[in-house]
């Protein structure tokens, strides 16, 4: 029996269009990102008017929290929930509003989408646990395991999980170390050894042949996991992320970027920390990236955090992959430079098959994780999995 009720669940749709809502590229992206899960055009007018002229995170979060409360008062639950998530996204880790706002978002979304408590599990891992949701159709045609990246709460992705569940896939969402509840509640910090949480999830659910998808930073982590976990038979990098450090340093405006590269490359810790302290005052994107990176790694300084993220690369292990692989990228991704798509392609020298897809402005899918036309991305993944047919089981071990 389908383990995600009910017949009263709201219809899920994904709007098409990337909108100019704020002149700051980072804020504008996040406004579009969370609108993309709701699709209520009234959000566009509300957000554009409310954040006009706002150029600091404290005021931005105050305004978005107010929009969320107003939406909930009007019983616009999905809109209100994602407004809360949008505001929480920019709240620093020490803010007392952060965890309560996160929990309200989760509770509201689960209730609105009619997600039954029985689909939720806590998977033992290290000194803590990993949260997971399993959404199973009546007659599954395969298993899809999904995780996020640098800043994700997996609940945000539930509308997409419903899409794949309704397409016939036994769909499992989980958070690994440094993500969502695994970080905030179980206190597990980010680790590049992603085959370990994937192994824990596959063991817990007794799975032997899956498609594994990672989104955002997860597009690099999924390559790492697939290199060492043979039960991963198909791989989706949504989007590619073969070099996380390059993406992080890209958030530094030029020409300071070159100076930071030089200081970091020479191992000058004091110079890196001093430079970052000054640079974040000039870049909202960098301010957020450093704040989030320190939070999800549990490290104390920008230098330590950048050294940690230097380990998040795929060039050294990509040749180990022998699976079917789908790589995706946005032509105008402001986090991940587009050259990382061919970079990743050239290192996958032993895969069974390789499909790469670059999304463009003409499709309104040119941005990170195809924000602006996420439905197109989800349909592509579904078509790719369908086209490959059923996964062949591995021979039984003697």
Locations of regions flagged by a protein language model:
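Catalytic histidine-centered segment of alpha/beta-hydrolase-like enzymes
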Residues: 91, 360-376
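Short beta-strand/loop motif that positions the catalytic acidic residue
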Residues: 321-322, 327-329, 333
């Amino acid at each position: 029996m389908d383990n995600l009720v009910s017949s009263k669940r709201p219809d899920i749709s994904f709007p098409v269009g990337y909108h100019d809502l704020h002149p700051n590229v980072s804020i504008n992206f996040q406004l579009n990102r969370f609108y993309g899960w709701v699709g209520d055009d009234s959000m566009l007018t509300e957000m554009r008017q409310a954040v006009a002229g706002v150029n600091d995170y404290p005021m931005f979060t105050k305004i978005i929290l107010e929009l969320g409360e107003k939406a909930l008062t009007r019983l616009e639950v999905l809109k209100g929930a994602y407004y809360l998530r949008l505001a929480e996204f920019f709240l620093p880790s020490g803010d007392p509003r952060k965890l309560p706002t996160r929990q309200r978002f989760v509770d509201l979304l689960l209730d609105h989408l009619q997600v039954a408590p029985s689909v939720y599990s806590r998977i033992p891992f290290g000194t803590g646990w990993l949260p997971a949701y399993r959404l199973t159709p009546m007659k599954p045609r395969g298993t899809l395991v999904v995780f996020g990246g640098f800043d994700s709460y997996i609940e945000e992705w539930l509308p997409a999980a419903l899409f794949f569940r309704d397409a016939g896939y036994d769909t499992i969402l989980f958070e690994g170390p440094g993500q969502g509840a695994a970080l905030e509640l179980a206190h597990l910090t980010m680790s590049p050894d992603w085959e370990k949480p994937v192994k824990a999830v596959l063991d817990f659910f007794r799975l032997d042949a899956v498609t594994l998808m990672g989104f955002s930073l997860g597009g690099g982590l999924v390559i790492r996991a697939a290199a060492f976990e043979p039960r991963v038979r198909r791989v989706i990098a949504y989007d590619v992320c073969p070099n996380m450090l390059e993406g992080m340093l890209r958030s530094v405006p030029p020409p300071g970027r070159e100076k930071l590269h030089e200081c970091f490359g020479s191992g000058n810790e004091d110079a890196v920390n001093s430079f970052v302290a000054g640079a974040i005052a000039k870049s909202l994107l960098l301010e957020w990236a450093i704040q989030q990176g320190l939070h999800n790694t549990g490290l104390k300084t920008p230098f330590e955090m950048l050294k940690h993220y230097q380990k998040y690369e795929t060039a050294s292990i990509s040749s180990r992959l022998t699976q079917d692989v789908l790589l995706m990228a946005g032509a105008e991704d402001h986090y991940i430079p587009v050259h990382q798509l061919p970079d990743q392609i050239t290192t996958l020298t032993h895969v069974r098959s390789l499909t790469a897809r670059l999304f463009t402005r003409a499709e309104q899918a040119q941005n990170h994780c195809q924000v602006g036309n996420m439905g197109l991305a989800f349909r592509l993944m579904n078509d790719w999995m369908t086209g490959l047919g059923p996964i062949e089981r591995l021979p039984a071990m003697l």
